C-alpha cells in the first residue's frame, strides 16, 4: 500500500497490516528510519518553506530596490558606470546585512520552538517511546489518550470509550465516538469512517491504539490543506505595522512625486532626477524594519527562554508587552496544584469509607482524561485499593463533559451491576431521588436537599474543592451506559480536596497589578472555595460572576458587567471564551493561561494564549507561549520582557519617523531653491546604509524601569504626532546647514553635498540618545553597543570626505571650521530635541488623563 489518502478504513485489518508490513508490536527503529527516508517527514508543507538562497533573493523583491537597480543599470549604459557600481554595492551590502541578521534571528527562534514541540507515543521495538510528530511514518503503532492530537491518518486497532473532535475537518464540534471494528458498509467519506482517526483531530476522552496509514501531505488534512488554511486574524501589533506602512507609503509617494516634478520643472537631467527620487524613497522607507522587528522579537524570545517562557509565535511577545488583563484558572496559579483528598463524608457530614470506596471505583475505571482529583483519590493513604476494586470489572462509561460536569462508570461483579456517578455536587444532586444513611436508603426530601447543600457550602467555605458521589443499581442485562441512566440516583456523599495556596502567588499578583495587569480568575470551582483561596493569599475580591449569570447575559450586557469583576466561578469553557471576547471588546489586550483539554478555544480567542509544558497536546498546540513552570512569577518576568521588546521596536520606528523623516523632508524642500540636487543618489543611499548600521544594536538596548511598569501598546496616532513634532526640529537644523554651506563657505556642489551629508547623518544618528527614552536622556544609559555604533558611524561619516573613496562618491574635504560649527549645531539640536520631546510627552500625558 502506498502512502496516499485512500479509503483505508474500508480495508480488512489483516490486509492493511500486511500492505504496510506492520504488526501490533510496532516498527523497529531501523525500519522506521528507512521509512522516514522513503516517505518524508510527517509535515503539512503549507508554509512553503524556502531555501536560504531564495530567502536572500526575496529581499531584492522590494519594488524600490528593483527600480533603483534598473535605473542605475540604465545610468551605466549611458556612461555613468562608476555611480552605478556604487549604488549596486550599497544596495548589495544593505540587503546582505538585512538577510544575515533576520536569518540568524529566525533560526534561533525556531530552535526554541522545538523545545516544546508536540510529541506522540509510538511502539518502537515493542516498547512505547515518545517521538516528535514529524518522525511518525506509515506502519507505526500510535498510543492515543484524552487530550492528544492525532498525529496522522490511522486505523484503530483497539479503542475504549474513545471520542474524537473532528471539527478541523468537518466543522462539527460535537465529539464523535470511534470503534476498532470493521465498517458494516463501505464509504468514501472520511467523516463516516468510525474506525479511523485523522491528522489534526483531537482526542476528547478514552484511549486507543492505532495503525498509522498516511502521513504528511498524503493525509485527509493534507489533501484539503489549501482550503482549510486560513491566516489567523492579525494581532494588534501586526495591524499597527500595517497602519505604519500605509502612513510611510503615503508620505513617500507624495515626496517622491513632488521632488521629481520640481526637478522636471527646473529642467534637470531626468534620469538623475529619477534616481534621486527613488533614492529618496529608499531613504524614507524603513526597509530595516522587518529585520529590526524579527531580530528584536527573536532576541526577546531567547531572553524569555532563559526565564522559562518558550515563544511559539513571535508577534505574541508584543501582545504580551501590551497585556493589561490576564485570565487564568485558580489551580496551579493561586494554588500549588498538589491536590490531596482530605475528607470523604456521607450526606450527614460523617466520615464514610463507603463514599471513599465509590469514589475510588469511579476514578479507577474512568478511561477519559484523568484529572488531578482522580489522582488524589487513587493515591489516598486510607484506601486499600486491591480490596476496593476486588472482582469488579468495567462494562461501560459515560465520559466527563463540561455541560454535564460529571462522569459515570458502569461496573459489574457476580451478577450485580452498578452505575457510579462523580461530579460537580449541584449537578449530581439534582439527579438524585434518594440518599444513603449507612445501610439505609431514604427518599430525598426538600429538607434533605437543603441540608446537603448547606454541607456542600460549609466544606467550600473551609477551602475544600468538593465532588458529589452518587450511585444506582441497574439490571444485569444493562450493557451500555448512557446519559439517561444518570437519573433516580442515590446520593452517597462528598469527597473534599485541598490544594494548598501558592506562597509566591500573592507577591506575583501584586507585581502584576502594579504593572498595570489585572488578574481575573476563571474557574470551575465554587465561589466559596475560590474566595477562601483568595483570602489566604491576600487577593482582594472586587466582584463575582457565576457561570449561570454569564450564560443568561447577551454579549453587550456581559461586557458592561465584567469591568469590576475579578472572580468568575462555575465557568465552563464556552463561557470562558465569551468572557475573554468581552474584555477584548472593551479594548483590553487579554492573556489567557490554560492547560486543559477544552482550553483551546479560549487560548485562540485571547490576544496572548499561554499554556504550560505539562499541558495536554491540544492546549500546547493552541498556545502562543509555553511556560516551563506554572507560576505567575514567570508571567511577571515575561510581561517585563515583552514590554522591553516592544519598546525597542518603537525606538526604531520613532527614529525613522522623526529625524530620518525630517532629513528626507529637508532634502525634498531643498530642490525648490538649489540649482543642483541636494545629494547625489549614491550619497542618499550611503546615508541610509550608515544610518541603518547605527541602528543594528537597538534590539539589545536598555529600557528604563519606568517604561516597564505599564503596558506598552502600539499607537499609530502617537507615532504620527511624534513625527510631526520631532521631524521639523531636524529640518530646522538642516536648513541652518544649508545657510552655513551657501553663505559662510560659499560652497560649490561637491562641498555642499559633503557638508550636508555629514551634518544630516550626525544629527539623524545621534538623535537616538534622545528618542530612546521618554525620560531624561542624560539619566538613561544606552546599551554600550548602541552607543559605540552610533558614535562610530558619526566618526566614520566625518572621515569619509578625507578617504580615497571621496571623489568616487562626489565628496571633497571639509574645512576645519565646519567641524567646529557642526559640533555646536549637533549639541544645540540634541538640547532642543530633548526639550521638544519632554513637552510632547507632557502633552500626551495630559490628553490621556
Predicted regions, residues:
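Non-lumenal N-terminal regulatory segments of integral membrane proteins
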Residues: 1-128, 134-137, 142-150, 155-163, ...
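Soluble-to-membrane junctions at the N-terminal ends of transmembrane alpha-helices
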Residues: 41-73, 106, 127-129, 187-196, ...
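Alpha-helical transmembrane segments of multi-pass membrane proteins
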Residues: 58-77, 91-98, 118, 246-264, ...
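Helix-interface capping motifs at the ends of transmembrane segments in multi-pass membrane proteins
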Residues: 66-89, 247-285, 298, 302-308, ...
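Hydrophobic alpha-helical transmembrane segments
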Residues: 82, 86-117, 124, 232-328, ...
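Basic, amphipathic juxtamembrane/active-site segments
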Residues: 163, 169-170, 180-184, 336-358, ...
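Cytosolic catalytic regions of ATP/NTP-dependent phosphoryl-transfer enzymes
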Residues: 196-204, 319-490, 497, 510-511, ...
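Membrane-embedded transport module
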Residues: 255, 259, 290, 541-592, ...
Amino acid at each position: 500500500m502506498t502512502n496516499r489518502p485512500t479509503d483505508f478504513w474500508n480495508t480488512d485489518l489483516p490486509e492493511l497490516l500486511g500492505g504496510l508490513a506492520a504488526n501490533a508490536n510496532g516498527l523497529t527503529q531501523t525500519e522506521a528510519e528507512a521509512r522516514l527516508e522513503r516517505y518524508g517527514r510527517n509535515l503539512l508543507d503549507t508554509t512553503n518553506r524556502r531555501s536560504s538562497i531564495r530567502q536572500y533573493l526575496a529581499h531584492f523583491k522590494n519594488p524600490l530596490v528593483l527600480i533603483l537597480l534598473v535605473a542605475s543599470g540604465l545610468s551605466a549604459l549611458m556612461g555613468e558606470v562608476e555611480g552605478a557600481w556604487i549604488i549596486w554595492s550599497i544596495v548589495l551590502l544593505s540587503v546582505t546585512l538585512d538577510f544575515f541578521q533576520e536569518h540568524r534571528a529566525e533560526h534561533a527562534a525556531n530552535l526554541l520552538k522545538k523545545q516544546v514541540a508536540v510529541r506522540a507515543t509510538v511502539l518502537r521495538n515493542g516498547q512505547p517511546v515518545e517521538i516528535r510528530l514529524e518522525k511518525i511514518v506509515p506502519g507505526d503503532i500510535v498510543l492515543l489518550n484524552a487530550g492528544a492530537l492525532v498525529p496522522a491518518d490511522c486505523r484503530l486497532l483497539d479503542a475504549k470509550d474513545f471520542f474524537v473532535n473532528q471539527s478541523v475537518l468537518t466543522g462539527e464540534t460535537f465529539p464523535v465516538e470511534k470503534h476498532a471494528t470493521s465498517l458494516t458498509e463501505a464509504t468514501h467519506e472520511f467523516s463516516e469512517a468510525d474506525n479511523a482517526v485523522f491528522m489534526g483531530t483531537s482526542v476528547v476522552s478514552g484511549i486507543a491504539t492505532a495503525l498509522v496509514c498516511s502521513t504528511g501531505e498524503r493525509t485527509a488534512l493534507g489533501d484539503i490543506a489549501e482550503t482549510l488554511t486560513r491566516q489567523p486574524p492579525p494581532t494588534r501589533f501586526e495591524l499597527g505595522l500595517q497602519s505604519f506602512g500605509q502612513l510611510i507609503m503615503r508620505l513617500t509617494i507624495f515626496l517622491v512625486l513632488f521632488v521629481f516634478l520640481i526637478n522636471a520643472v527646473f529642467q534637470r537631467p531626468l534620469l538623475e532626477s529619477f534616481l534621486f527620487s527613488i533614492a529618496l524613497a529608499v531613504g524614507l522607507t524603513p526597509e530595516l524594519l522587518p529585520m529590526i522587528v524579527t531580530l528584536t522579537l527573536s532576541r526577546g524570545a531567547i531572553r524569555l527562554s532563559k526565564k522559562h517562557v518558550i515563544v511559539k509565535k513571535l508577534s505574541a511577545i508584543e501582545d504580551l508587552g501590551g497585556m493589561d488583563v490576564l485570565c487564568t484558572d485558580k489551580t496551579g496559579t493561586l494554588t500549588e496544584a498538589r491536590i490531596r483528598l482530605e475528607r470523604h463524608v456521607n450526606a450527614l457530614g460523617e466520615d464514610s469509607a463507603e463514599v471513599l470506596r465509590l469514589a475510588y471505583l469511579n476514578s479507577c475505571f474512568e478511561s477519559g482524561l484523568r484529572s488531578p482529583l482522580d489522582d488524589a483519590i487513587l493515591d489516598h493513604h486510607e484506601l486499600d485499593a486491591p480490596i476496593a476494586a476486588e472482582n469488579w470489572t468495567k462494562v461501560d462509561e459515560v465520559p466527563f463533559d463540561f455541560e454535564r460536569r460529571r462522569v459515570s462508570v458502569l461496573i459489574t461483579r457476580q451478577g450485580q451491576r452498578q452505575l457510579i456517578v462523580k461530579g460537580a455536587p449541584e449537578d449530581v444532586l439534582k439527579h438524585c431521588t434518594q440518599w444513603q444513611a449507612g445501610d439505609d436508603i431514604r427518599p430525598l426530601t426538600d429538607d434533605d436537599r437543603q441540608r446537603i447543600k448547606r454541607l456542600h457550602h460549609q466544606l467550600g467555605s473551609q477551602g475544600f474543592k468538593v465532588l458529589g458521589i452518587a450511585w444506582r443499581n441497574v439490571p444485569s442485562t444493562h450493557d451500555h451506559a448512557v446519559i439517561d441512566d444518570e437519573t433516580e440516583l442515590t446520593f452517597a456523599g462528598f469527597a473534599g480536596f485541598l490544594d494548598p495556596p501558592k506562597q509566591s502567588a500573592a507577591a506575583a499578583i501584586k507585581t502584576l497589578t502594579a504593572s498595570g495587569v489585572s488578574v481575573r480568575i476563571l474557574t470551575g470551582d465554587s465561589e466559596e472555595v475560590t474566595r477562601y483561596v483568595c483570602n489566604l493569599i491576600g487577593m482582594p475580591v472586587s466582584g463575582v460572576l457565576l457561570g449561570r449569570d454569564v450564560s443568561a447575559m447577551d454579549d453587550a450586557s456581559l461586557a458592561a458587567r465584567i469591568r469590576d469583576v475579578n472572580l468568575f466561578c462555575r465557568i465552563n469553557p464556552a463561557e470562558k471564551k465569551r468572557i475573554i471576547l468581552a474584555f477584548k471588546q472593551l479594548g483590553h489586550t487579554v492573556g489567557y493561561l490554560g492547560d486543559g483539554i477544552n482550553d483551546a478555544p479560549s487560548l485562540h480567542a485571547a490576544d496572548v494564549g499561554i499554556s504550560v509544558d505539562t499541558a495536554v497536546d491540544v492546549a500546547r498546540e493552541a498556545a502562543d507561549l509555553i511556560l516551563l513552570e506554572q507560576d505567575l512569577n514567570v508571567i511577571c518576568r515575561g510581561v517585563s520582557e515583552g514590554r522591553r521588546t516592544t519598546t525597542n521596536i518603537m525606538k526604531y520606528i520613532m527614529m525613522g519617523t522623526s529625524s530620518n523623516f525630517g532629513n528626507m523632508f529637508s532634502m525634498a524642500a531643498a530642490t525648490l531653491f538649489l540649482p543642483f540636487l541636494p545629494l547625489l543618489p549614491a550619497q542618499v543611499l550611503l546615508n541610509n546604509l550608515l544610518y541603518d548600521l547605527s541602528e543594528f544594536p537597538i534590539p539589545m538596548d536598555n529600557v528604563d524601569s519606568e517604561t516597564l511598569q505599564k503596558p506598552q501598546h502600539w499607537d499609530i496616532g502617537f507615532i504620527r504626532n511624534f513625527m510631526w513634532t520631532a521631524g521639523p526640529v531636524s529640518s530646522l537644523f538642516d536648513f541652518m546647514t544649508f545657510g552655513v554651506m551657501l553663505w559662510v563657505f560659499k560652497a560649490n556642489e561637491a562641498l555642499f553635498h559633503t557638508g550636508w551629508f555629514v551634518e544630516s547623518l550626525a544629527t539623524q544618528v545621534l538623535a537616538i540618545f534622545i528618542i530612546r527614552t521618554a525620560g531624561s536622556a542624560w539619566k538613561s544609559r544606552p546599551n554600550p553597543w548602541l552607543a559605540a555604533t552610533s558614535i562610530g558611524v558619526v566618526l566614520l561619516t566625518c572621515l569619509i570626505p578625507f578617504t580615497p573613496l571621496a571623489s568616487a562618491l562626489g565628496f571633497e574635504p571639509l574645512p576645519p571650521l565646519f567641524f567646529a560649527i557642526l559640533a555646536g549645531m549637533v549639541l544645540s539640536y540634541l538640547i532642543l530635541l530633548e526639550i521638544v520631546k519632554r513637552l510632547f510627552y507632557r502633552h500626551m500625558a495630559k490628553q490621556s488623563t
